[in-house]
A protein has these predicted regions:
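Rhodanese-like catalytic fold shared by cysteine-dependent sulfurtransferases
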Residues: 1-20, 28-74, 81-116
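Active-site flanking residues adjacent to catalytic metal/cofactor-binding acidic residues
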Residues: 23
Length: 116
């Protein structure tokens, strides 16, 4: 599987889809200020550590299992500019997850589904 990069214009199409989870990997403070509607906050450092533990030891954290437990779902990851979310998207895709990332990240998103 590979990580698909989607334009910020396509994000609104996925927001209310029950088979999609949008994951904000920015710091909690930024997430609380503004985010894409219904996005789950899983901070980058935490996600990176959890993914590294899967690769190194085969250990899956409780939170990772709760959030990413369904490999049939599509996971859309985003960060500020799209760089770190692309890295995480590629690692998760290699683990068999259907992942997408937003080109340009949250800064590029100009859609109608923002929670403040």
């Amino acid at each position: 599987m590979s990580c698909e990069m989607i334009s910020s214009r396509k994000v609104d199409y996925y927001v209310n889809d029950p088979y999609v989870l949008i994951v904000d990997i920015r710091e909690r403070e930024k997430y609380l200020k503004s985010r894409i509607k219904d996005a789950y906050n899983y901070e980058y450092e935490h996600l990176k550590c959890d993914i590294n533990n899967i690769y190194a030891y085969g250990k899956v954290s409780f939170e990772f299992r709760q959030v990413f437990g369904n490999k049939d779902k599509i996971y859309i990851l985003y960060c500020d500019r799209g760089v770190t979310s692309l890295l995480m998207c590629e690692k998760m895709s290699a683990l068999g997850y259907k992942c997408k990332t937003i080109v340009g990240g949250f800064e590029a998103y100009k859609g109608n589904c923002i929670d403040n």
